[in-house]
Curated annotation (Swiss-Prot):
ATP binds at G236, C237, G238, K239, T240, L241. HAMAP family: ARC_ATPase. The gene is arc. The keyword Coiled coil applies. Keywords: ATP-binding, Coiled coil, Nucleotide-binding. GO terms for cellular component: proteasome complex. Pfam families: AAA (PF00004), Prot_ATP_ID_OB_C (PF16450), Prot_ATP_ID_OB_N (PF17758). It comes from Corynebacterium diphtheriae (strain ATCC 700971 / NCTC 13129 / Biotype gravis). Gene3D superfamilies: 1.10.8.60, 1.20.5.170, Nucleic acid-binding proteins, P-loop containing nucleotide triphosphate hydrolases. Homohexamer. Assembles into a hexameric ring structure. It comes from the Bacteria. This is AAA ATPase forming ring-shaped complexes.
Length: 509
């Protein structure tokens, strides 16, 4: 409503203008926010409508660094590089993202997935000869991550991550194929941990350690150290322990600054169904041994369960695999490449199955039989496991004497009928081994702990050891069944007349 007073009209109009200006500012702000939201939605819509990006492997520059050779979708292509891409980041083997026009628009990381292959040999021009799990060999290029800014190049035997279609290897997988079959750490077993095998320890000390500790004397007498040692005998009697103790002793003798190595080859895991794979793995093991033996460092290659790999050729006991595996080992032992500072130690409880060519002088020169422990040796083994710091209910000497007397008592187990008509009684004592004694002591300790918890008495007692011996005799898995009577003679380590029949007698338990 207009008034006659001009001043009031002016004030009213100014208020109206101010309100309209404020409303207009709010509308402008809302319009701007709507436009921004619409722009975001439009961008999202465009992103959703955009074609999918593809990825490829950058191989090399071409055309004066203006184009790139890229392997993508199973095809080798030459593509343009977007100006937004930093060309310094484009290194061989890196993953790149391709735009709608098949243009390199983004540099990604080096590929982290692919197939595994073993490097056989390094070639010129950053290439390598690889072998896959089927035994097929091919040549691939090594990505920049393997050749640029690294302390050392990949070596033969390394496991590589490869893309066989692109023809590139991207990464060294830390676990080499040799390390999957072997353990290079020096064991912590010492001669003091082995009981009842003093004569065998002395023999292997003379055969293995003297050449490394007295090299000047060996050269003066023009005497070459043995290439290998065979430890054979019944199972569970300390063959593997001796080999580990030798490696530990060598490490102690030569000092911390020049360590020794113990390559423990897991025999059955060497076997492979593909032709030539087992032989190739043996070559890799000896290549690794020669590499470690540089600069005079002693290396022990220990083959456990040796008969599983190197059986007599033409025996018909297994497949024809041994006809090529045995010659491969003989080649490594007698080959042109020297095995200096490398000692082969083999362990087996079936020495009759090993090919004689491996056992002849000049190969496995020293053969040491590891016998089952007698009463005195058994006392020594018990003493290794019943140490002074272990709680006992009576003197340790008394415990050991009572246990040994019970273990070696006249307790018949089986009657063997030989082919000449004679018979032989085997007692439980004929099956005693160091591993069995260790298990007996562990059983006794467990019984002592249970008695201590029950509040009866504290410490290992003779009754615990005797109960453990009885339980071990009853449950021992060392004894074969009677379906093959000759197994009884083999398991106790006797060789003579063939067994025609075995009759279980049982015994006092």
């Amino acid at each position: 409503m207009l008034t006659s007073d001009p001043s009031e009209s002016t004030a009213h109009l100014q208020r109206t203008i101010s309100n309209l200006s404020a409303r207009n500012a709010k509308l402008a702000e809302l319009l701007k926010a709507s436009r921004d939201k619409l722009s975001i939605l439009q961008d999202q819509l465009e992103d959703l409508a955009a074609p999918p990006s593809t990825y490829g492997t950058f191989l090399e520059f071409s055309g004066g660094r203006e184009t790139a050779e890229v392997f993508t979708a199973g095809r080798h292509m030459r593509l343009r590089i977007s100006p937004d891409v930093e060309k310094a980041e484009l290194v061989p083997g890196v993953q790149v993202r391709l735009g709608e026009a098949s243009q390199v628009v983004e540099v990604c990381d080096i590929s982290t997935t692919g197939q595994l292959a073993t490097l056989v040999e390094l070639l010129a021009d950053n290439r390598g000869l690889i072998c896959d799990h089927t035994g097929e060999e091919r040549v691939v290029k090594l990505a920049a991550a393997l050749t640029e800014g690294v302390d050392k190049l990949p070596k033969a035997g390394d496991t590589l991550l490869v893309d066989p279609r692109a023809g590139y290897a991207f990464e060294v997988i830390p676990k080499t194929e040799v390390s999957t079959l072997a353990l290079e750490e020096v064991p912590d077993v010492t001669y003091a941990d082995i009981g009842g095998l003093n004569s065998q320890i002395e023999l292997i000390h003379d055969a293995v350690e003297l050449p490394f500790t007295q090299p000047d004397l060996y050269r003066a007498y023009d005497l070459k150290p043995p290439k290998g040692v065979l430890l054979y005998g019944p199972p569970g009697c300390g063959k593997t322990l001796i080999a580990k103790a030798v490696a530990n002793s060598l490490a102690q003798r030569i000092g911390a600054g020049n360590r020794s190595y113990f390559i423990n080859v897991k025999g059955p895991e060497l076997l492979n169904k593909y032709v030539g794979e087992t032989e190739r793995r043996i070559r890799l093991i000896f290549e690794r041994a020669r590499e470690l033996a540089e600069e005079g460092r002693p290396v022990i290659v220990f083959f456990d369960e040796m008969e599983s790999i190197f059986r007599t050729r033409g025996s018909g006991v297994s497949s024809d695999m041994e006809t090529t595996v045995v010659p491969q080992l003989l080649t490594e032992l007698d080959g042109v490449e020297s095995l200096s500072n490398v000692i082969i130690i083999g362990a087996t409880n079936r020495e009759e199955l090993i090919d004689p060519a491996i056992l002849r002088p000049g190969r496995l020169d020293v053969k040491i039989r590891v016998e089952r422990p007698d009463k005195q040796a058994a006392r020594d083994v018990f003493a290794r496991h019943l140490k002074q710091n272990i709680p006992t209910a009576e003197p340790i000497d008394s415990l050991i004497n009572n246990a040994v007397d019970h273990l070696y008592a006249d307790n018949p187990y089986v009657e063997l009928s030989l082919i000449d008509g004679s018979t032989e009684i085997l007692h439980y004592r004929d099956f005693v081994s160091g591993a069995m004694i260790a298990n007996i002591v562990d059983r006794a300790k467990k019984c002592a702990i249970k008695d201590h918890i029950a509040g009866r008495h504290s410490g290992v007692a003779s009754e615990h050891l005797i109960a453990a011996i009885n339980a071990e005799n009853h449950e021992s898995e060392d004894l074969p069944n009677t379906s093959n009577p000759d197994d009884w003679s083999r398991i106790i380590g006797r060789h003579g007349l063939r067994v025609a029949h075995a009759r279980v007698l049982g015994g006092q338990r």
